[in-house]
C-alpha cells in the first residue's frame, strides 16, 4: 500500500493533483484544505496517502498532515460514508472543528456539512465519539475564535484566488456577495469561494 508520496507537482486542481515520482504520474484526490497548502506546479510536494482498494480500481487520497489522514480513515469506518464523501467532509470543515462537533454531539453543526443528513450526523457521533476523544486532534470544550477580521480574510482569499488564475474582478464580486462571519478563517472562506467559482 502507498502511504506517502514525494515528487514533483505536475498538475493541481481543487479536488485532485498529479504527482510525478521518477517519471510516473500518480493521481491523488485531495480535500480543499490540502489544495490550499500546495506549492506551485513544478515544485516538490509530499503528501500522506490513503490507498483505497476496490475490486475494479485503486484510488489514492492525499493529505497535508498525518492527523488529517487519520481522521479521513475514521470517517470511512462509519457505515454509509465512502472515501469521496469523507474527502468532501474534510473539504468543508477542519478536523479540529469536526472533532469538537462529534465529541460535543453537535448534530446541528454536523448536519450543516454538505452531504451529511441528520441520520449520518447521528452515526458519526455514535460510532466516533469515543475514538475521537483518544486522538491528538480531539479539541478542548471550546474552540478559540479566529482573530482575523472579515476584511483581512477577504483580502487574503482574493490574493490566493488571483494566484490560482481567477480574475480579480470576478473574485471580488463573489466575495462581495458572500456572507463572511466575523470569526471565519481564511481557509473556510477560500473553500466557500472556490465552490461558487467552480459551479
UniProtKB/Swiss-Prot annotation:
UniProt family annotation: Belongs to the RuvA family.
An example Gene Ontology molecular-function term: four-way junction DNA binding
Record remark: domains: Has three domains with a flexible linker between the domains II and III and assumes an 'L' shape. Domain III is highly mobile and contacts RuvB.
Domain of life of the native organism: Bacteria
Region (Domain III): 154-199
One Gene Ontology term from the biological process aspect of the record: DNA recombination
GO cellular component terms given for this protein: cytoplasm; Holliday junction helicase complex; Holliday junction resolvase complex
Region Flexible linker, annotated ranges: 144-154
Protein name: Holliday junction branch migration complex subunit RuvA
Entry keywords, A to Z: Cytoplasm, DNA damage, DNA recombination, DNA repair, DNA-binding
NCBIfam families in UniProt: ruvA (TIGR00084)
Region (Domain II): 65-143
Region Domain I: start-end pairs: 1-64
Keyword Hydrolase applies: no
Biological role: The RuvA-RuvB-RuvC complex processes Holliday junction (HJ) DNA during genetic recombination and DNA repair, while the RuvA-RuvB complex plays an important role in the rescue of blocked DNA replication forks via replication fork reversal (RFR). RuvA specifically binds to HJ cruciform DNA, conferring on it an open structure. The RuvB hexamer acts as an ATP-dependent pump, pulling dsDNA into and through the RuvAB complex. HJ branch migration allows RuvC to scan DNA until it finds its consensus sequence, where it cleaves and resolves the cruciform DNA.
Quaternary structure (record): Homotetramer. Forms an RuvA(8)-RuvB(12)-Holliday junction (HJ) complex. HJ DNA is sandwiched between 2 RuvA tetramers; dsDNA enters through RuvA and exits via RuvB. An RuvB hexamer assembles on each DNA strand where it exits the tetramer. Each RuvB hexamer is contacted by two RuvA subunits (via domain III) on 2 adjacent RuvB subunits; this complex drives branch migration. In the full resolvosome a probable DNA-RuvA(4)-RuvB(12)-RuvC(2) complex forms which resolves the HJ.
Subcellular location field: Cytoplasm
InterPro entries the record matches: DNA_helicase_Holl-junc_RuvA_I (IPR013849), Hlx-hairpin-Hlx_DNA-bd_motif (IPR003583), NA-bd_OB-fold (IPR012340), RuvA (IPR000085), RuvA_2-like (IPR010994), RuvA_C (IPR011114), RuvA_C_sf (IPR036267)
A Pfam family hit: HHH_5
Main location: cytoplasm
